[in-house]
Amino acid sequence: VRNKADPLAATPVPQKLLWWLTFGFVGTVLFPIIYTIEGAARPGYDPLRQTISSLSLGPGGWVQQLNFALCGVSVLWMAFIWRKILAGGVCATWYPILRAIEGVGLFGVAIFTRDPVHTVFLVVIVNAMCFGLFVI
């Protein structure tokens, strides 16, 4: 949040936005926790040989699909919040856009569990994450 009188001075982020950011953060932290538990509970799953996307296949695949979708919601939510927090400047424009692309990609991975579309969405997610690091 920018101070209009002095653009270099930081204005405290409103408490409401900090809570919203915390909820989005918790949603993204739950993602690896859920896939770790799901991978441990899935017979025959080897995390050293198989990707977490393979957990979305088979009879219990709905758990990982839901995990991808919930993480997508969290990332989209955080993109919205970051847009409000980073008022003005290049970061305020591009970082939330790249995060939103990542969130939509997570939805795509949840819906399309098989290649080639699944891989296309994975490439979109990874690129959005990498470009987001350069924008910051």
Residue ranges and their predicted role:
Residues 1-7:
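Short, intrinsically disordered terminal tails adjacent to the first/last structured region
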Residues 8-51, 55-136:
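Hydrophobic, aromatic-enriched alpha-helical segments typical of multi-pass transmembrane helices
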